[in-house]
Amino acid sequence: MGGCTSKPSSSVKPNPYAPKDAVLQNDDSTPAHPGKSPVRSSPAVKASPFFPFYTPSPARHRRNKSRDGGGGESKSVTSTPLRQLARAFHPPSPARHIRDVLRRRKEKKEAALPAARQQKEEEEREEVGLDKRFGFSKELQSRIELGEEIGRGHFGYTCSAKFKKGELKDQEVAVKVIPKSKMTSAISIEDVRREVKILRALSGHQNLVQFYDAFEDNANVYIVMELCGGGELLDRILARGGKYSEDDAKAVLIQILNVVAFCHLQGVVHRDLKPENFLYTSKEENSMLKVIDFGLSDFVRPDERLNDIVGSAYYVAPEVLHRSYTTEADVWSIGVIAYILLCGSRPFWARTESGIFRAVLKADPSFDEPPWPSLSFEAKDFVKRLLYKDPRKRMTASQALMHPWIAGYKKIDIPFDILIFKQIKAYLRSSSLRKAALMALSKTLTTDELLYLKAQFAHLAPNKNGLITLDSIRLALATNATEAMKESRIPDFLALLNGLQYKGMDFEEFCAASISVHQHESLDCWEQSIRHAYELFEMNGNRVIVIEELASELGVGSSIPVHTILNDWIRHTDGKLSFLGFVKLLHGVSTRQSLAKTR
Ligand SMILES: Nc1ncnc2c1ncn2[C@@H]1O[C@H](COP(=O)(O)OP(=O)(O)OP(=O)(O)O)[C@@H](O)[C@H]1O
Ligand SMILES: [Ca+2]
Ligand SMILES: [Ca+2]
Ligand SMILES: [Ca+2]
Ligand SMILES: [Ca+2]
């Protein structure tokens, strides 16, 4: 088998931004940190009635509608996941979380090994001692009246319900019931704890399901939230035969991007964005969309990279498979949703999950088949920029809302972008030479880029002299903050911007600080703009530099082979940076950054 389960073939380029050990794991590899990886309920997996979602089962390519209507687990069917959404779709959420698939395979292989069997027995013994107390209220009975089942997932089912008393008396709500019997490892318990913690911490966004309370008894955990009676986005896509007009797709994507930008600013990465996990509040055509199911979500610090492989196969980003990722992985999933909305087909499709992973890693989605040729250039450009395999080139959720395809449709308040912090931090740690190079490059920003930066600058509340300072940033964050920010250590990260404590930053310098070289590089005008930037740099910034200094600038040792390479980056005639050196210097710090990130 290929994809995630075998070594990448030689045509797969090694991931330049991934840590050295972050290549695709092969079948019998163990996760880097078994204790931390979100292995989800392995014994439950075996007992689960779901088939692996990829099982080819040509006879059953119809979606089982009754499943939604509260059918038991046995009603879940496996369908052949065709590329065309219009004809068939795998049952909602049968896509096992990827880790489960990998793990089951591993277990199958290892079952024969006595050592593995012994380990399994140990794990089972461990289960007996698991502490399944969450510290949630035990008062469900007196507070909530449970109604009928309205939805079902891998981990539990959801019922409609009503508050019996209190402020919310008679309010209809939804209760997700997660049986404790399914929590068979410390990790699966931790997952539920985190799901509630994240829901509790994130609040106040109109496209995020409102959390009310969590309860528990001996049998279950109960998550009480706002009732979304309009069904899953997936069902609407299917009902339309999988095709949305551009404007209808925009209306959906704006809501998705808005709430995801919000989550990212709070330091939460969802990790399971797909049409099943967006619900409409009511049956009305233009009712509001809400993101649900934070069961795979995690907090992520601005300078942290995650390494556990979770998500659903069709929506998983390449860097997740490479085990080094952060918030950009969610944006990829939105790209997959956007592609599906616009054409009704999946961008990365295969009959097996390893085939899907291979496609995600290597294949470029097709924009040649109908209806793509009849769609606007902007629509295609938008989707492509969400599906860049290099996450550094990919738009952020906030940037995507500024993309001409969206911006031309509706005036939107652009959410504050967490990327800006990361960029400013890297800038403040750069040498004066690199700052000068960035300043030169920032003179070539396009109108769209400038609009985006203006919006971001405004978020940081510049003072009356037009300067942003650490205090203004702090204030700006405080107005956007939820409890989640503490968990993702955003305030700690701010301390790294202390370079702004006494010296403010004007818009001009902000542009130099915030420009993302990798994103700028992906523009059509890159070639021209980098040449122009070098001319500006020559007039105002270039200076004599020695190899040792350059090596330290780039965060590489100055060993002999490095010396040979760097030699080309310095102009022999006058000892200043050559064009090549200029380009490398601009990219340089991100190399150092990503090295630092993998520590
Ligand atoms: N707030 C809600 N209002 C209405 N229905 C809901 C709500 N939350 C969940 N549901 C329904 O219950 C289903 C399962 O919920 P959820 O996706 O959170 O469970 P899960 O067990 O984590 O699922 P998965 O298998 O996708 O991981 C949803 O797909 C949806 O149909
Ligand atoms: Ca579901
Ligand atoms: Ca779900
Ligand atoms: Ca889930
Ligand atoms: Ca974490």
From Swiss-Prot:
Gene3D superfamilies: EF-hand (1.10.238.10), Phosphorylase Kinase, domain 1 (3.30.200.20), Transferase(Phosphotransferase) domain 1 (1.10.510.10). Residues 1-13 have a biased composition (Polar residues). Residues 1-128 are annotated as: Disordered. ATP binds at I150, G151, R152, G153, H154, F155, G156, Y157, T158, K176. The modification Phosphoserine is found at S37, S312, S578. GO terms for biological process: positive regulation of gibberellic acid mediated signaling pathway. Residues 430-450 are annotated as: Calmodulin binding (CaMBD). GO terms for cellular component: membrane. Its EC number is 2.7.11.1. It catalyses: L-seryl-[protein] + ATP = O-phospho-L-seryl-[protein] + ADP + H(+); L-threonyl-[protein] + ATP = O-phospho-L-threonyl-[protein] + ADP + H(+). Ca(2+) 2 binds at E509. A lipid is attached at G2 (N-myristoyl glycine). It is a lipid-anchor. It is an enzyme of class 2 (transferase). Ca(2+) 1 binds at S472. It is found in: Membrane. Residues 411-441 are annotated as: Autoinhibitory domain. Residues 144-406 form the Protein kinase domain. Residues 448-484, 485-520, 521-560, 563-592 form the EF-hand domain. This is CDPK-related kinase 2. Activated by calcium and calmodulin. Autophosphorylation may play an important role in the regulation of the kinase activity. The lineage of its organism: Eukaryota, Viridiplantae, Streptophyta, Embryophyta, Tracheophyta. Ca(2+) 4 binds at D574, K576. May play a role in signal transduction pathways that involve calcium as a second messenger. Keywords: ATP-binding, Calcium, Coiled coil, Kinase, Lipoprotein, Membrane, Metal-binding, Myristate, Nucleotide-binding, Phosphoprotein, Repeat, Serine/threonine-protein kinase, Transferase. There are 3 contiguous domains conserved in the CDPK subfamily: a kinase domain, an autoinhibitory (junction) domain and a calmodulin-like domain. The autoinhibitory domain (411-441) inactivates kinase activity under calcium-free conditions.
